[in-house]
Amino acid sequence: MESFLFTSESVNEGHPDKLCDQISDAILDACLEQDPESKVACETCTKTNMVMVFGEITTKANVDYEKIVRETCREIGFISDDVGLDADNCKVLVNIEQQSPDIAQGVHGHLTKKPEEIGAGDQGHMFGYATDETPELMPLSHVLATKLGAKLTEVRKNGTCAWLRPDGKTQVTVEYFNENGAMVPVRVHTVLISTQHDETVTNDEIAADLKEHVIKPVIPEKYLDEKTIFHLNPSGRFVIGGPHGDAGLTGRKIIIDTYGGWGAHGGGAFSGKDPTKVDRSGAYIVRQAAKSIVASGLARRCIVQVSYAIGVPEPLSVFVDSYGTGKIPDKEILEIVKESFDFRPGMISINLDLKRGGNGRFLKTAAYGHFGRDDADFTWEVVKPLKSNKVQA
C-alpha cells in the first residue's frame, strides 16, 4: 500500500493573528457574561505599539474594552517592547458601533422571536470533520502541531525555557496510509518549530531544549524514528516577534482553528462572534455531528456540511460524506444526522449553551484550536447519541 505525506501547522498564543483572535473572544466573553443576548461582531488588528478593536456590538453589558485588551496582552506575555508589545503602554484604539438595525430585524426581530424562529445571522456554509486516527477524533498532523504550540507556551510560562518569547509557529508532516478511505498514521516525517527567543540563547541550546522539553513530551515515541527530520528555528534568528514582527488580524488562522487542512472550510472565522453568527455556531454543530457519527461506529471518517440564508432559521442544505468508510450508505447517515441534530441557529445556541460567556470560555477557544479539546466548556465536543435503529457502537 502506498503512503503519502500530509502537513498541518499551528501558531501559539503570542502570534499576532492569534493575539487578535484572543482579544476579540475576550470581549465576546465579557459581553455574554453580563448580557447573554449580546450581539457581537468584534474584530481586532495590531501592529507595533498599537491594538485596535472595531466592529458592531449591541449589548446591555458595561464593558471596558481597553482594559480587556491590555489584560489579554499581558496574560499572553506581551509585557515589554522587547518581546513585541508592551501591554501597559501600547496605544489602544476602539471603534465599536451598534449592530445594523437591518440585520437585527431580519435575524432576531429585535428579540421578539422564539429561539426556533431566530434566523441565521448571515449566509454561508460550514464544515465539520472527524476521523478515528486519534482519541480526540481529530487529524494527527493537526493534533501534534497544535500540542507542540501549547507546550511551547507552557515551558515559557513555567520557566523551563526562560529564553522563550511569546510568538511561535509549529508544523508537522505525517506519513499516512489510506485504508479504504480511513486515514492511518504511520510515522512523523518532519517536525518544524520556529519560536521567538531572547538575545542570550544560542541556536544549539534552542534545538536541544526544543527536543527535550517540547517535542519529546508531545510526540509519542512510536511515531518518531531515525529518519524523522527536525527543523528547529531554521531561519537562524527570531528575536523580533509579536506585533512588532508582523501585523495581526482576527480571523486569519481559520485552518489552525479547525482541522489543519483536512476536511474542508467554508471560509468564515470564529473569534469575536456571538452564536447568531452561523460561521461559529454552524461550524460547532457540524463538528458535533461528524464526531458523533465516527464515535458511534457509523463511519471511520466523516465530513458534514450545513448552509444558511440570512434571516432564515432552517438550513438550506445538509451534506454528509463518509469517504467510503460508512457502515451504511451516506444517504442513511444523512437521515440520522437530520433526525439527531437541530441546525436552526437559535436551537444550536440552546443545545450547545453558546450564550454563556465569562470565565474565559470563548477566550480558551481562540488559541490551540476549537475542536478536539477535553474541556467541559467545549460543549460541541460532547458525543451525542444518534437517533436510529441502525446505530451500533
UniProtKB/Swiss-Prot annotation:
Pathway: Amino-acid biosynthesis; S-adenosyl-L-methionine biosynthesis; S-adenosyl-L-methionine from L-methionine: step 1/1. It is an enzyme of class 2 (transferase). Binds 2 divalent ions per subunit. The metal ions interact primarily with the substrate. Can utilize magnesium, manganese or cobalt (in vitro). Binds 1 potassium ion per subunit. The potassium ion interacts primarily with the substrate. L-methionine binds at E56, Q99, D246, K277. One of its GO terms (molecular function) is ATP binding. It comes from the Eukaryota. ATP binds at H15, D167, G168, K169, S235, G236, R237, F238, D246, R252, K253, A269, K273, K277. The keyword Magnesium applies. Mostly expressed in flowers, seedpods and roots, and, to a lower extent, in stems and leaves. Its cofactor is Mn(2+); Mg(2+); Co(2+); K(+). One of its GO terms (cellular component) is cytoplasm. Mg(2+) binds at E9. Induction: By ethylene, polyamines (PAs: putrescine, spermidine and spermine), methylglyoxal (bis-guanyhydrazone) (MGBG), and AgNO(3). It catalyses: L-methionine + ATP + H2O = S-adenosyl-L-methionine + phosphate + diphosphate. InterPro entries: ADOMET_SYNTHASE_CS, S-AdoMet_synt_C, S-AdoMet_synt_central, S-AdoMet_synt_N, S-AdoMet_synthetase, S-AdoMet_synthetase_sfam. Keywords: ATP-binding, Cobalt, Cytoplasm, Magnesium, Metal-binding, Nucleotide-binding, One-carbon metabolism, Potassium, Transferase. The keyword Metal-binding applies. Disulfide bonds: none annotated. It is found in: Cytoplasm. Its main location: cytoplasm. Its EC number is 2.5.1.6. K(+) binds at E43. GO terms for biological process: one-carbon metabolic process; S-adenosylmethionine biosynthetic process. Catalyzes the formation of S-adenosylmethionine from methionine and ATP. The reaction comprises two steps that are both catalyzed by the same enzyme: formation of S-adenosylmethionine (AdoMet) and triphosphate, and subsequent hydrolysis of the triphosphate. Homotetramer. This is S-adenosylmethionine synthase 2. It comes from Brassica juncea.
